[in-house]
Amino acid sequence: MAPLDPQKDALAKSYANRLPALVRLTQAGQALEFKFKGTHCAIYDVIGPAGGKVAVTLDGGAPKVVTRFDAYCTYARLSTFTVGTKLPDAVHTVRLELLPDAFDKAAILAQRKETMDQPERFADRHFLPGGLLLRGELVP
C-alpha cells in the first residue's frame, strides 16, 4: 500500500507537512501490520466525514475496535489513538484492520446538534493513518 500522492489527492496535500506517508484504507479487510521494539505505540491519522471503524490487535491479543469518527467529524482533522502504553520493552506486533461495521454517524453528530449537510460525504467508512508515535523503534 503506497502513500497517497499530495499532487493528486487533496486530503494528502492538506496534511503532507505532518503526514507525508498518509495512506487510505477503503475496503473492509484491508490491513496494515508492523513490528516495533519499545514501550508505547500510538497512531497519528486523519478523521472526518468518511471515518470508519478499525480493529487494533496488539501481539495477537483480542482486537480492540476504535471508531475513527466523532461528533466533530463534519470536517477532516488530525487525530491520534493509543495502541499500547507501558508495554514491556520488547518486540510487539500491531495489526490495524478496516472493519465493515456500519454505525449511526447522524446520531454521533447529533451529540453536538450537528447534521449531515450532504449525506453522501458521510457514506464511506475509511481509515487514514499517516504516522506512528513510538517510544521505541520499528523493526523488520
Residue locations for each model-derived region?
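Glycan-recognition surfaces in beta-rich domains, encompassing non-catalytic CBMs
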Residues: 1-140
